[in-house]
Amino acid sequence: MRLILLSGLLLLGTFLANGHDTDPEGQMLNSVIESVMILQKEFANLKHAFLTVHKARSFGSGSERLYVSNKEIGKFEALKEICDQAGGHIPSPQFENQNKAFANVLERHNKEAYLVVDDPANFTNWAAGQPNEADGTCVKADTHGSWHSASCDDNLLVVCEFYFIL
């Protein structure tokens, strides 16, 4: 059985290698191969264009993560839903450059926004006297990027974090 299967594969390979431009199957096969090659080239071009824009945006912000606001104001639960629907996340800066990029958005809008602090965090930027759970169980960043405990019911600027893994 294996011998028959191997023979069939060998014959198919020989048939495909010969091209057979004149018969309809050969023409169709050549057309499919040509289409795949065109699609591969288009994909490579799109990937290059995407990476160029992403690198330019990252260069401008100093962070691989992008922080974007839709200028809406909302409570923590609304923010989670909005960011999820947009394909992003609630901001969670892991490094100083990410926190700076996040703070730039807040400074530009002159508003505070929620963020999530991982436990244990590699990076924190708590303001003096913070965290203070008496102020609330959520965390917000001020326009300078300093972190404060906050109520989850505060209406703050909606900012979502986006990052790309390639």
Swiss-Prot record:
Q: Where is the C-type lectin domain?
A: 46-161
Query: Superkingdom of the source?
Result: Eukaryota
Q: Keyword Ligase on this protein?
A: no
Q: Which UniProt keywords apply?
A: Calcium, Disulfide bond, Glycoprotein, Lectin, Phospholipase A2 inhibitor, Secreted, Signal
Quote the PROSITE patterns the UniProt record gives. C_TYPE_LECTIN_1, C_TYPE_LECTIN_2
**Keyword Signal found:** yes
UniProt GO molecular function: carbohydrate binding; phospholipase A2 inhibitor activity
Q: In which tissues is it expressed?
A: Expressed by the liver.
Query: In terms of one coarse class, where is the protein primarily found?
Result: secreted
GO cellular component terms attached to this protein's record = extracellular region
**Coiled-coil positions:** none
Q: Which residues form the signal peptide?
A: 1-19
Spell out where the chain is glycosylated: N122
Q: Which cysteine-cysteine pairs are annotated as disulfide bonds in the entry? A: C83-C160, C138-C152
Q: Name one Pfam family in it.
A: Lectin_C
**InterPro entries (alphabetical):** C-type_lectin-like (IPR001304), C-type_lectin-like/link_sf (IPR016186), C-type_lectin_CS (IPR018378), CTDL_fold (IPR016187)
Compartment(s): Secreted
Family stated for the protein in its record: Belongs to the alpha-type phospholipase A2 inhibitor family.
Which proteins does it associate with, and in what oligomeric form?
Answer: Homotrimer; non-covalently linked.
Function (record text): This phospholipase A2 inhibitor binds directly phospholipase A2 in the presence or absence of calcium.
Q: What is the protein named?
A: Phospholipase A2 inhibitor clone 09
Query: What organism, scientifically named, is this protein from?
Result: Lachesis muta muta
